[in-house]
């Protein structure tokens, strides 16, 4: 199977967790878009759901395909969020934000009872950091914030290029009006320490480390679907099922 077909298979497996009447957080990115297309088929045949999109891009696709939408203001508590990821580690800590919607994705995930991550096998890693970490920052004081991020990372033994995300020759601007810095720190051994340190920088709006939010990962590979469940309590093992 090619990469797109793997995304479709992961999305199809996630759709099995959706039931009539659910309030759904709907992610952003190419894998999440495959889920939207499959969800739209279910809606067309009578399934009733309400979707809360994590980006204007996702909202536009949902409207085009007829998936009913709400907002977090109208629907502040969600049953399930389905979203993709740029990297997934064995504890279901994620790097997200490659699609530029990490702030809204994190807010929606936190408002959900459960979060299912869908991805192909290439996104599974032992330690996060191969994919550059997206950091959403205020436009004001950009250079000062970039320097503060580099110094904070250095205090944790991390270093590497920090680049402003560009699109069409201009700085990429998020739906919230912010810039994104992509930090190529390499291997991140202590994600929680980095998360806390980045949150302490005034110019940082949010970062792409998702810690303790994903409850299940559905991973598609050439040998089938692997379902990984997050540990339910400290010290317990993450559970793996292969279908």
Swiss-Prot record:
CDD domains: RPI_A (cd01398). Its EC number is 5.3.1.6. The active site is at 105 (proton acceptor). InterPro entries: NagB/RpiA_transferase-like, Ribose-5P_isomerase, Ribose5P_isomerase_typA_subgr, Ribose5P_isomerase_type_A. One of its GO terms (biological process) is pentose-phosphate shunt, non-oxidative branch. Pfam families: Rib_5-P_isom_A. The keyword Iron does not apply. The keyword Translocase does not apply. Pathway: Carbohydrate degradation; pentose phosphate pathway; D-ribose 5-phosphate from D-ribulose 5-phosphate (non-oxidative stage): step 1/1. GO terms for molecular function: ribose-5-phosphate isomerase activity. Keywords: Isomerase. Homodimer. NCBIfam families: PRK00702.1 (NF001924), rpiA (TIGR00021). Belongs to the ribose 5-phosphate isomerase family. This is Ribose-5-phosphate isomerase A. The lineage of its organism: Bacteria, Pseudomonadati, Pseudomonadota, Alphaproteobacteria, Hyphomicrobiales.
